[in-house]
Amino acid sequence: MRLTRDFYAKDARALAKELLGKVLVREVDGIKLKGKIVETEAYIGAIDKASHAYGGRRTKRTEPLYGKPGIAYVYFIYGKYFCFNIISKTEGEAEGVLIRALEPLENINLISKLRFNKEFEELNNYQRKNITSGPSKLCMAFNINRDNNWEDLCESSSLYVEDVFYNDFEIIETVRVGIDYAEEARDFLWRYYIKDNAFVSVK
């Protein structure tokens, strides 16, 4: 069963933890790709200098951040990569969760072809470990791009999160990645991951 709007309508920090162990589903050419969410980061616009919406900043690019909980915010970085976020809390609050890493579960050959243009069996150990172990890596592997920006995960048939109950794990809380510019916010312990999971991007 997919997650509902009520599930997403909470503080980004709480949602980031509760998404761990849930399963992201992405349909590509009629085939459902599935991956367990193993690493997330929370962003809270009002108080977070790492957020694209810090201090109420509102632009065409960041407008999805102000949308309903459960909306996808997909943004472009470094001129070639995408990052996928899910909006939380309430409309207008500019809170969201970055999905940082997935553990591939179903249709791994297609995931591998999208990521490396190779069958999974052809990948070396480094490639297998890095197939979805980072926000842009998982976007490539699950074909998530600007077309998914604003997509409603509560209604979409091609991008949503399943309420699968994987809960036999310990959650590590630590600093976020790549936000040294964010002054005191760089020290917020708002990154969460499943302890000892091989697909976590940074431990």
Swiss-Prot record:
Database matches in InterPro entries: Formyl_transferase-like_C_sf, MPG, MPG_sf
Pfam short name (any one): Pur_DNA_glyco
EC number, as in UniProt: 3.2.2.-
Species the sequence originates in: Clostridium botulinum (strain Langeland / NCTC 10281 / Type F)
Record protein name field: Putative 3-methyladenine DNA glycosylase
Biological processes, Gene Ontology terms: base-excision repair
GO terms, molecular function: alkylbase DNA N-glycosylase activity; DNA binding
UniProt family annotation: Belongs to the DNA glycosylase MPG family.
Domain of life according to the entry: Bacteria
Enzyme class: hydrolase
Keyword terms: DNA damage, DNA repair, Hydrolase
